[in-house]
Amino acid sequence: MRDKMCPHKSELKAASPLFLNRIKTGILPRMNTSQFTLVLDQIESLIRKSCAFLKGDLDEDQIELYSLSFSQAELLAARTVLASSEKNPNLSNIANYFAADVITSITQKFAVRPKTFGLHASELPDLESVQDFLSPAYISALGQHFLDNGLPESDVDEDKRIIRDTFRTFAEEVVMPLAEDIHRKDLLVPDEILEPLKQMGVFGLSIPERFGGLKPDTQEDSMGMVVVTEELSRGSLGAAGSLITRPEIMARALMEGGTEEQQAKWLPAIASGDTLCAVSVTEPNTGSDVASVALRAIKTSGGWLLNGGKTWCTYAGAASALLVLARTDKDIKPAHKGLSLFIVEKPAYKAVSYTHLTLPTIY
């Protein structure tokens, strides 16, 4: 009965005997990149077919289109990792595992409800060729290999290696000793972390050089930010790794839609760290669903009046500028349109207060 319902054999089994024997002899099996690429090509054609079937109706097919978008991102990641392993053979084992995981993940999304994607179960890839790389035996052997030999070097240039080593040292020597108290005692991010990061130019990683940042004026380069974020997050995601996210979001918003006057005022201040910023999107009753944003922005004689509630605004206290998402047109359809971003200036303060409420018992 199971085979009739699911003829593509999506369930994973134990590794094959030959595969297991190779692992037991200390050899980590590998599959040729071209073999993975064939399966990834097959999956990409299914994604394209599904997109054509759904016709891009974001409201009607929101769940399916989100799944397809996520799958396309996974697919690109798998191709990128496999391409890196061609240049750096030390990455091949983990690339095999990652590609097998992506192939299985996407296939199983389709397998649950193929008809809603405009597919038939018989079109889905047979996972027999990749399932060995997801077996417990292979994963355990891969983990032991890394414990014994260390992780392979990532595929970055010499400049990025220097950046990585610098921020790894900072994370280990500065962030890690402070991280436990910050988390356990709900402390604010201290100046011992913020000030050195300002001096190292961290807040300008997404800002072009002409505005005092570190990003080249002539090309997009996010790899430096990725490397720094990864290393700071090793020390603490909350106390260091996520510090870069807010200035990046505000900088990109300013570069995309800000006036020249706004760019000249805000970008140098953000790049230097003189202006810490926060992003205010999430609302109490709707989370971060932009189609449901209710905070209103109404044009007045003196500018704009923002009226509504926001919550979970990281670094809101220490920030002197908030990037606020507000609804400027309540009648436009679809609902994810009619929104604008506002930069709201505020006094920066380093204080936290809590009000404890005793609520009546509700049955």
Please tell me what each predicted stretch does:
Residues L237-E261, G287:
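N-terminal glycine-rich flavin-associated loop
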Residues G303, N307-S353:
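A short core secondary-structure module
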Residues G273-V281:
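A short, Trp-centered hydrophobic/proline-enriched beta-strand micro-motif
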Residues S92-F110:
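Charged, glycine-rich active-site and insertion segments that engage polyanionic ligands
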Residues I23-D61, L65-S69, A83-E86, L119-S242, ...:
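Amphipathic, small/basic residue-rich leader segments at the start of a protein or domain
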Residues H356-Y363:
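Single conserved hydrophobic/aromatic residue that forms the stacking wall/gate
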